[in-house]
Structures are given as structure tokens and as C-alpha cells.
Amino acid sequence: RYTTSNAIHQGSKLPEAELPAFFDWLYDLEYGKMGLPRPDLVLYLDVDLPTSLKRMQHRQEKHNTKADIHEQDVAYLENCLRIGRLAAAHYGWTVVPFMKDGAERELEEKHEEIFSIIRSAL
């Protein structure tokens, strides 16, 4: 989880043309040189920005917390979504869309898709 998150958050600071080389370098560093265990499967849960913002607001209200410095920067979040999609394509992650026809998919539908992907990978 940390390497994949790192690819997105650190990658968001780079020009798009440099991303493929950065993605390759990061995986080589963390999985090759540092010897971290390489995941057998990565699921990228693709959520649009308005839904992501709504979920963050709900979490903040529910737990009486404030947005961190990154969560307050909507442009940064939007860029991370874009970089996440590029990273998913580069690395071959399995993308699970959380949206369908402009609305969030039902929980059961998302659950079934994720469970099916995991079951197939076992």
C-alpha cells in the first residue's frame, strides 16, 4: 500500500513526461533494492473528485476532525486522481470504478466486483 500510494503522491509533483521513468525507478528501489514484498494484486478504487470530497467531509464531520494539508488542496487531489489513473495503467493495476453514469455504484455491486477479482487471483 505504501509504495503504490508513494507512486501517486510523489508522482503528482513531477511533469507527466517524467512519470514512466519515475514509476519504474520507484518500483526498482522499493521492491528490488529494498526488498519490500511485491503485491500479487493491486486494486485501484477509482472515485471521482466530487465523491471523494463528499466522503472526506462526511468523515471529518463523523469523527470531528479537520482536513489535513493535502485534503485541503483540491487541485492537488484532482492531480492525484489523474496520476493514480496513469500509475494504474503503467503498472497494470486492476481498476475498480466506483462510479457509473455519474453516480456512485451501490455498495453491494462494488463488493461483488472486488470479491470476484480477488477470488480469480487466488
Each predicted region: which residue ranges?
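A glycine- and Lys/Arg-enriched "phosphate-lid" helix/loop adjacent to the NTP-binding pocket
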Residues: 3-82
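NTP-dependent small-molecule kinase module
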Residues: 50-122
